[in-house]
Swiss-Prot record:
It comes from the Bacteria. It is a multi-pass membrane protein. This is Uncharacterized MFS-type transporter YvmA. It is found in: Cell membrane. One of its GO terms (biological process) is transmembrane transport. GO terms for cellular component: plasma membrane. Its main location: membrane. The keyword DNA damage does not apply. Belongs to the major facilitator superfamily. TCR/Tet family. The keyword Transferase does not apply. InterPro entries: MFS, MFS_dom, MFS_Efflux_Transporters, MFS_trans_sf. Keywords: Cell membrane, Membrane, Transmembrane, Transmembrane helix, Transport.
Length: 403
């Protein structure tokens, strides 16, 4: 994929805004859950199911689509995904049957799941070295902004135009993205497709799991996103039950985490070329582990101290995802789609498991002990996995796969 710098930048922002839209589609839905329940006359459990299936489908599609991208190319997956998202959004807007709504929501998840995956894969193809890290920071920054503004937009649009208004807007944006990507996104090179097709899907995933760097990043990303969502889900309970803060005001206390995450991605863009990915890898994991332990110590003592530790945690969560993504794309040049797909799948699995397992832990022991164990566990895991990752033999398997 040879492109001029201006063309590469145009493609970068097109796929990054497409990924931003995918995150928007997921997070804009939360504020209208009461409207969905009332409009379709269904139980809270059924409404929550519509949230869960979206995440489950998104996670599963990462593995499926990653392999398809490697063997068939990204453009066909991108265009098909946006078409599916547009059609499903229209279906969600017009249907009056909740079962059909659920099916359309699943199709929407399958379509939009392709967009962040293709963005990360395309960045790996268009950029190398420090430029790749900077581009990955841009990608992650837009992904970080979406969860911060999507609930606000969802509440505003849902209040003014109902849930239908949200899905009509998502459909309209999908059509704009379809046109834009059709014009700007490059056609897949036949020679690249033939080169990639020499392997098979099992060989691609085997190379990921037998690669030391891949194993370390996948393991740490699962644990980190497990902890991140355990904290996210626990916060409203802590704020309302321990500090007796109104739910509306409690939402504002997510801002330190959201804003510092955005700041962390910006920081990654600025420093990744200066200090090196391996040094940044060690430092960001140390900061993440320390901030989790500090949260365990401070969360029930002081709102101010808790906000500061959340801000520190947010900075590490802004740095680590683009860092891990960059290292994955650097490590797996010939099966990049499969590797990024597996990385995203592991992240989503951690997100889903964190709230469930942490809820059980909180019934067994005090919250301070629960989060201390999680923080110490992440620190110990990082310490144990770093030496194998930096072993000089870590690239052997990947080289064999490249042939």
């Amino acid at each position: 994929m040879a492109h001029t710098k201006s063309k590469a930048v145009l493609i970068l922002y097109t796929v990054c805004f497409s990924a931003f839209f995918a995150s928007l589609s997921q997070n804009i839905y939360s504020p209208i859950l009461p409207i969905i329940k009332e409009s379709f006359h269904v139980s809270t459990a059924m409404v929550n199911l519509s949230v869960s299936v979206f995440m489950i489908v998104t996670a599963i599609m990462q593995i499926i689509l990653g392999a398809i991208i490697d063997f068939k190319g990204a453009r066909i997956v991108l265009i098909t995904g946006i078409l599916a998202t547009a059609a499903a959004s229209i279906g969600c807007a017009v249907t009056t049957d909740f079962t059909l709504f659920l099916i359309f929501r699943m199709i929407q998840a399958a379509g939009s799941a392709a967009l962040p995956l293709i963005a990360a894969t395309t960045i790996g193809q268009l950029f190398t070295g420090n430029e790749r890290g900077s581009a990955m920071g841009t990608y992650q920054m837009l992904l970080s902004v979406a969860p911060a503004i999507a609930p606000v937009l969802g509440g505003f649009i849902g209040g003014a135009a109902g849930y239908e208004g949200i899905f009509w807007i998502l459909a309209a944006i999908s059509i704009v993205l379809l046109v834009t990507n059709s014009i700007t996104f490059p056609k897949d090179s036949p020679t690249e497709s033939m080169q990639q097709a020499k392997g098979n899907v099992f060989a691609h995933y085997k190379s990921i799991f037998t690669n030391r760097t891949g194993n370390v990043i996948l393991t740490l990303s699962f644990v980190l996103f497990f902890i991140y969502f355990a904290v996210i889900v626990y916060l409203p309970i802590l704020l309302t039950e321990h500090y007796h803060i109104d739910v509306g005001i409690a939402g504002l206390l997510y801002l330190p985490l959201a804003l510092s995450t955005i700041a962390g991605t910006f920081l990654f863009k600025r420093i990744q070329a200066k200090i090196g990915l391996h040094t940044l890898f060690i430092g960001s994991n140390v900061i993440a582990a320390c901030s989790i332990i500090l949260f365990a110590v401070t969360h029930s003592v002081s709102l101010v101290l808790m906000a500061l530790t959340l801000a520190l945690f947010g900075i590490s969560m802004g740095v680590i995802p683009p860092l891990y993504s960059t290292m994955i794309t650097n490590e797996f040049e010939h099966n990049r789609g499969s590797a990024i797909g597996m990385f995203n799948f592991i992240r989503y699995t951690g997100m889903a498991a964190g709230p469930m397992v942490s809820a059980y832990l909180l019934t067994m022991m005090p919250s301070a002990m629960s989060f201390s164990l999680l923080g110490l566990g992440f620190a110990a895991l990082s310490f144990c996995l770093l030496p194998p990752m930096f072993s000089p033999q870590k690239r052997t398997k990947q080289k064999k796969h490249h042939m």
